[in-house]
Every structure is written in C-alpha cells, then in structure tokens.
Amino acid sequence: MVHIVGAGPGDPELITVKGQRYLQAADVIIYAGSLVNPALLKICKTDAAIYNSATMTLAEVVAIIEKAEQEGKMTVRLHTGDPSVYGAIQEQMDAFTKKGIAYDVVPGVSSCFAVAAALKQEYTLPGISQTVIITRNEGRTPVPDMEKLRKLASHQATMCIYLSITMLDKVVAELIAGGYADDTPIAIVQKASWPEEKIVRGTLATIVNDIADKGIDRTAMIVVSRCLGADYELSRLYAPEFTHMFRKASQ
C-alpha cells in the first residue's frame, strides 16, 4: 500500500503522529527532496530504500511504487506541508487507481499555518477578516480568470499567497489594483518553522524595498491582511453575555 504523507512545513516535530508511524515502518520512501526536511529521513528503517523525487518524472515515481507493490512492500510518498495544497498528488492518485494500487492520504500542517505561528497571528479576527484565501500568483501554471489576484483582492480578506515570492512586485501591483490600500499590512515568511526562518513585515507600499537585501527568493509565503497588527473586536465565544451549548451567559 502507498501512504501519501504530509511532512509538515519543515520542523521535523510538526509531522503528524500517523505520518511519523508510517515513515518509520515504510520499506520504500519517495520524498520531495527540494522541500522536505532531510532530518525526517533519520527515523526511517536502516534498510529502507529512499528516493528523491526532485530528479524524477511522474512515470519514474509510479514505476518505483508499482515495483514495491509487486514485492509486497509498503511505500510512503512524502510531500511537504499538506499534500492537498499545491502537492501535485491528484495525478499520482489517478495513476495508482488505474494500476489498482491501494493508497491513502495523511494530512499535514501546511506552511500557511506555520507562518501564522511564526507571526504569532490569528488570520480570522472579528470585525477584520473571517475569511482566509489560499492562492498563488499566475506563473507557469495558469490561474482561472476569476481567481486572479486582482479579483480575489476585492474581498479584502486575509490572503496566503504561495509560490509567488519571485514575483512580489507583480503580486503587490495586482493586490493594489484589486482594492487593497497601499498601507495594507503584509508579511513575508521564509522557511517557516525551520531554524533559518526569516520574517519581514511591511505594507504593500514598502514591502518590495523591505525585502530587497534580505536574500529571500524562494520557499517563502506572502500574507496580506488587515489582521496583521490591527485593532479588533473580541470574540463572542468567551464573552460573559454570550450563551452557547456548553456555557450559559453570566451577564
């Protein structure tokens, strides 16, 4: 069987308990070598066959897994973050289905949540934003017209923008064109949860200059939100006058 496992954002301790258990038991591991922390591989069996998918095609990945299945071996396909977010796992799962290979998916901590932890920031503040948009700027992978940054910006929601740091100037221009004000807070977090994590804060008007000398050109998340440093309303969940199914109002 194949277990598609989310490795989490980088810190080896942020893999799930189930993901760790599968990784420790696997006979074959195929990992996204350019993104997954190699420290995770230290918990694998000493005789496990380990492959770096960064140099492989889809057909090569599937061929290794198919051979492992024929030999009765368990495979872990180790992806960074959560496999369902920009993980390119659908084409793999479809290939497994066509070949009759059983598989499951173990979710992981996506980098947008590691970024929130690094920033010590909640993305959904009452009166500010109750929506989080996970997206990317258009690059080699096309983006549907209704999902272009300019149109998503009209919602004024918290936005977590993946895979776009090399196009930061274009991202900023699209966000402003879509309705965000120049003074909207923005944060760039590189390698969230890794020892070499970097955080740069600014506004849409300043951020391109703010990161110019920081050496941030890959593996970084862009977060734009009024939640970043904003005044906000207190949640009703803990208000003394608020009643819910577990607690009656005290005022």
Residue ranges, per PLM feature:
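Class I SAM-dependent methyltransferase SAM-binding "motif I" and its flanking Rossmann-like core
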Residues: 11, 82-155, 198-201
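Short, active-site-adjacent cap segments at secondary-structure transitions
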Residues: 37, 84-86, 112, 194, ...
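Class I S-adenosyl-L-methionine
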Residues: 1-109, 208
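Residue-level signal for well-ordered alpha-helical positions
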Residues: 42-43, 118, 174
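Short secondary-structure boundary/capping segments
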Residues: 20, 42, 67, 123-125, ...
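A contiguous loop/helix-start segment that scaffolds small-molecule binding in enzyme catalytic cores
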Residues: 2, 71-75, 131, 139, ...
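Short hydrophobic alpha-helical segments that form membrane-spanning helices or hydrophobic packing faces
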Residues: 15-17, 114-116, 171-172
